Amino acid sequence: MSPLLEVTDLAVTFRTDGDPVTAVRGISYRVEPGEVVAMVGESGSGKSAAAMAVVGLLPEYAQVRGSVRLQGTELLGLADNAMSRFRGKAIGTVFQDPMSALTPVYTVGDQIAEAIEVHQPRVGKKAARRRAVELLDLVGISQPQRRSRAFPHELSGGERQRVVIAIAIANDPDLLICDEPTTALDVTVQAQILDVLKAARDVTGAGVLIITHDLGVVAEFADRALVMYAGRVVESAGVNDLYRDRRMPYTVGLLGSVPRLDAAQGTRLVPIPGAPPSLAGLAPGCPFAPRCPLVIDECLTAEPELLDVATDHRAACIRTELVTGRSAADIYRVKTEARPAALGDASVVVRVRHLVKTYRLAKGVVLRRAIGEVRAVDGISLELRQGRTLGIVGESGSGKSTTLHEILELAAPQSGSIEVLGTDVATLGTAERRSLRRDIQVVFQDPVASLDPRLPVFDLIAEPLQANGFGKNETHARVAELLDIVGLRHGDASRYPAEFSGGQKQRIGIARALALQPKILALDEPVSALDVSIQAGIINLLLDLQEQFGLSYLFVSHDLSVVKHLAHQVAVMLAGTVVEQGDSEEVFGNPKHEYTRRLLGAVPQPDPARRG
């Protein structure tokens, strides 16, 4: 039986002003009918370029070589009008950002119907509209008849992604290509979208190629996985074999860096040191060698081939025998055990009582009038203790970020009270508020947006010091000390943010936040924008800083696995209220509220054995 999709020696090169960049370097794989194959790897590994080459959606300046056969038909080299007969009919595509995949000026029903009419001209408009409603029902949109008349902006993010899936399966495709289909979604919505994709596969019988960096999604959904690094496949196997008996040190590192719900608070992860190589002019040898804990001289001379190491299991490594049976912590020589917390009651550094924050709803353009209000935070009470972490979790719109902003405002709330370091913020004068701000600093979600690209690292870190009267010598000494603390080199002080990886940028943001020796750090989704291998290093750094300096963390996140590693106490928010809070081990291990149980049940676990 011939495969549904057969890719052979696929290479993708992008012409640039400098050296050409070969983003995909001779990969080969196949997808059988009804099979789910996952491409996984860090950002820049070439997985999205490899997938978009299959469907012919790369930019014009991309050079594609090799062979891509769909049911025996060669797709590479087809003219665009010929390729368009495959797109949307034989091949359905689900993109990461549904808003960019949908036209804002047409209803979602019209957009699904259009996909049917383009590829099935004999189907009339009315029949296409009826089929569009059926597809909305299939992908789980409530009241599909009415919602088919909605515009994309009138739907939630999860609903928009369901519409994109409906368009992708509208013509019963043979192959579904899903490019990070759940990345931007809340955990419960992510679980629902995976269920919809499973249903779509079962209904259409399509093979699925899914691109993701989430190893939990791979374990939950995929049958086989291709691990990509520096533009090529470095390990491929069935998902059960890959997770149980991985043979490539890179795969070991990826799995070791994943936060887990079953880990104790304070457990260190296994980060992969360094960053992926530039694909413009790779050095000889194995591209992973500079980051590999098992590297030997032979690794630096020739790039290893992808060879069989077991039945249907291949790896590109000459040291696979040193990987078998060893943990990631052992291979990467990292101590992961949680360190015992100091005993005794710690003082309360942030106390929130009956906090309320409302936003007025207004109607009209010229003569606006109030028509109601939204209670973004509805009477919540929280406590953060010295040297501890309070995790505030919940889905988008739950009120967790609003709560954090109200605390950081250091001003009288609409209702209720906020105490920071024993002071009621409603009583603060201008000078007292400025002084207190030194003790509570923020690390933002997006390290790129929080750093001025025009300033070198030294100026970025020195800015709060200079604003608070530090002298020149004192500032230089403190910046050098902060670079040491967050694991950067002194020479990095003269470089600019654009020269650093995402994880290094976040370390710069943390160094800046620590400059004035605060007692409290507010962490607003500090690792959600990072690859899992980089995220692990930041989580370890935050744990080490808390242990070293006795910092207190207010940690806002939608990622329950990350919260489990960091938080001593957890508050679960829903619709502006705290529905459950307490010790993190108790809340995660024995949740009492149905919403908490639903959140925990939706988290994809990096263990195929737990697959439902």
Curated annotation (Swiss-Prot):
Family annotation (InterPro entries): AAA+_ATPase (IPR003593), ABC_Ni/Peptide_Import (IPR050388), ABC_transporter-like_ATP-bd (IPR003439), ABC_transporter-like_CS (IPR017871), Oligopep_ABC_C (IPR013563), P-loop_NTPase (IPR027417)
A GO CC annotation given for this chain: peptidoglycan-based cell wall
Binding residues for ATP 2: R147, G158, E159, S396, G397, S398, G399, K400, S401, T402, Q445, H558
Effect listed in the UniProt record for changing C286S: Shows a significant reduction in the proportion of OppD in the Opp complex. Strong decrease in ATPase activity
Activity control: ATPase activity is stimulated by the oxidant H(2)O(2) and significantly decreased by several redox agents, including the reductants L-ascorbic acid and sodium dithionite. The 4Fe-4S cluster plays a structural role and might also affect the ATPase activity and the regulation of the substrate transport.
GO biological process, one term: transmembrane transport
Domain ABC transporter: from-to ranges: 5-255, 350-600
Keywords from the UniProt entry: 4Fe-4S, ATP-binding, Cell inner membrane, Cell membrane, Iron, Iron-sulfur, Membrane, Metal-binding, Nucleotide-binding, Peptide transport, Protein transport, Repeat, Translocase, Transport
Binding site for [4Fe-4S] cluster: C286, C292, C299, C317
Catalytic activity: a [peptide](out) + ATP + H2O = a [peptide](in) + ADP + phosphate + H(+)
Effect of C317S: Does not affect Opp complex assembly. Small decrease in ATPase activity
Membrane topology category: Peripheral membrane protein
Keyword Cell membrane: yes
SUPFAM superfamilies: P-loop containing nucleoside triphosphate hydrolases
GO molecular function, one term: ATP binding
Consequence of gene loss (knockout): The uptake of glutathione is compromised in the oppDA knockout mutant. Macrophages infected with the oppD-knockout mutant produce lower amounts of TNF-alpha, IL-1 beta and IL-6 and undergo reduced apoptosis compared to the wild type.
Cited function: Part of the ABC transporter complex OppABCD involved in the uptake of oligopeptides. Responsible for energy coupling to the transport system. Glutathione (GSH) uptake by mycobacteria through the OppABCD system contributes to the depletion of the GSH pool in infected macrophages, which impairs the ability of the macrophage to detoxify methylglyoxal (MG) and contributes to enhanced production of inflammatory cytokines.
Family: Belongs to the ABC transporter superfamily.
Protein name as it appears in the record: Oligopeptide transport ATP-binding protein OppD
